Amino acid sequence: MWRITPMRRLEMEDAGNQPMPPSLAPDVDRDRIQGLEQGVGPLFHRRYRTTIRDGSLTAHEVIALIERDPNVVAPTEFARFMRLAGQSGSMKVGDEYLVRMPGPWDGPVRVVDTTPTSFRLATLRGHLEAGQIEFRAHEEDGLLFEIESWARSGDHLSNLLYDQFRMAKEVQLHMWTSVLEGVVRLTKGRRSGMITIETRRVHVDG
């Protein structure tokens, strides 16, 4: 399952202001959403980035294809998106997916925001994490694709696996770096430089 991918990892302890995800719009269904306040342990704010050159797709086109079927960039031998609620076609706010993974890693999520160049998911009750994750693309000296997450562990066992044993953290790293590589393939371009992963670990009271 594991492979060598050129990447640069930066990890920081941060005692400053808590990085917060964007607020949910008033019309977003909050039922079963597992927000940061329901989480356990520290807050992890993570950014995964890759720059793509010589690709054949615009930022808008990339997001449109992924919204139609996230599995076009998912490492489907390891993880697969299954739509549980919503119509086929492009993502819409309120659609729900189960990210099916081996072992205890299955993750139910709901679409809480979409734009022409981004979409954002919130974790639902039963997910190993509590928080949100956003996928976005924009054209900046090539095509920059980013995945940004704001999350705490969903329960004490998840916190042990993620923060203490680091097992879940490495599974997550593999998942999202694989998605970035999938985006590169989707565009038929080439990755410029290394994939970068930045992690801020923030202590949360309570």
Model-inferred region functions:
Residues 47-49, 98, 120, 134-136, ...:
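Beta-strand secondary-structure signal
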Residues 126-170:
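Beta-strand/loop substructures that line and gate deep hydrophobic ligand-binding cavities in soluble
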Residues 33-38, 108-109, 147, 151:
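Short, flexible segments with low predicted structural confidence
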Residues 154-205:
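A conserved amphipathic terminal alpha-helix motif
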Residues 64-72, 126, 181, 185-188:
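Short, intrinsically disordered, mixed-charge
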Residues 78-81, 121, 178:
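Hydrophobic/basic alpha-helical segments enriched in Actinobacteria
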Residues 100-140:
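Hydrophobic-ligand binding "helix-grip"
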Residues 1-100:
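Hydrophobic ligand-binding cavity/cleft-lining segments
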